[in-house]
Amino acid sequence: KRNGLVEFIQTADPRESALAVEALTGRRDRKQLKPSLLKQAAYQAFADESWLFDECYAAVGDLSETLAILFANQDAVSQTAQPILDQWRQRQHALSQQKPEVLISELPSLLNTLSRDEAFLFLKLSSGGFRVGVSKGLVHEAIARAINMDRAVIEERLMGDFSPDPDWLDRLKAPVTQDELDAKPL
């Protein structure tokens, strides 16, 4: 996991890597789309045959996976090789600002623009269910290795506000200040 994160941080688009760090360290609003609204969207789409959704959900056991199976474009090819987190974040934010009835009616058509894997990840990130077994410490260690800095300095610099912009890594790479050295425990 660590080596994969190191490689990603070193090679990915800077904005994408910043958004990934934000998501992996739990710094973002996790539940932009409430699971109850996601279920309502499915029930509305299935209308009189909502029992079919219930059966699918019971068989699959995961709401995001069920919705991805039912509504994603099954013929779409995943575009995950391209930077997508920023685009998804903008979509999530736009959807979260909608009235519930608009969100409920638009969600199935939005999911149909994504591949099954993309829809699954989009829903997991949007509903707060994104868990990958990566601790904050592992992310901090990967960043430290990626830019060849002390992990304690990285952790201290990430304690405050984190702005997931393209310059995030450059700010972390800045030379260590005397204040940072003085604050480091002996």
Residue ranges and their predicted role:
Residues 1-186:
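N-terminal nucleic-acid-engaging modules of covalent nucleotidyltransferase systems
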